[in-house]
C-alpha cells in the first residue's frame, strides 16, 4: 500500500513538470512550441526541434542593447595587461 502511494505521488510530480512550457534560451524571451500562436513570431529554433515563439508585445517591452559608438580614427592609448600569444595545436602542425 505504501509503495502504491509513493508511485501515485511520483506520477503527479512527473506530470506537473512536463506541463510547463520550456523557455528558449537565457537571452530570448520566448517559449518552445510546435506552432506559434496568433500574435507571436518565429525567431530561432529550440534544441528540441521546436520553434522559439516570441510575443510581439513582450518584445516591445525589452529594449535592445546597443554597443557604444567608437571612433574608427582614434587609437586607444591604454596599455593592455595581457599579450595574445599564438597557439599551436595538433591540427596546425
Curated annotation (Swiss-Prot):
This is Beta-defensin 128. Residues 1-18 form the signal peptide. It comes from Pongo pygmaeus. It comes from the Eukaryota. One of its GO terms (biological process) is defense response to Gram-negative bacterium. Has antibacterial activity. Keywords: Antibiotic, Antimicrobial, Defensin, Disulfide bond, Secreted, Signal. It is found in: Secreted. Belongs to the beta-defensin family. The lineage of its organism: Eukaryota, Metazoa, Chordata, Craniata, Vertebrata. The keyword Secreted applies. Its main location: secreted. GO terms for cellular component: extracellular region. The keyword Signal applies. Disulfide bonds join 24-52, 32-46, 36-53.
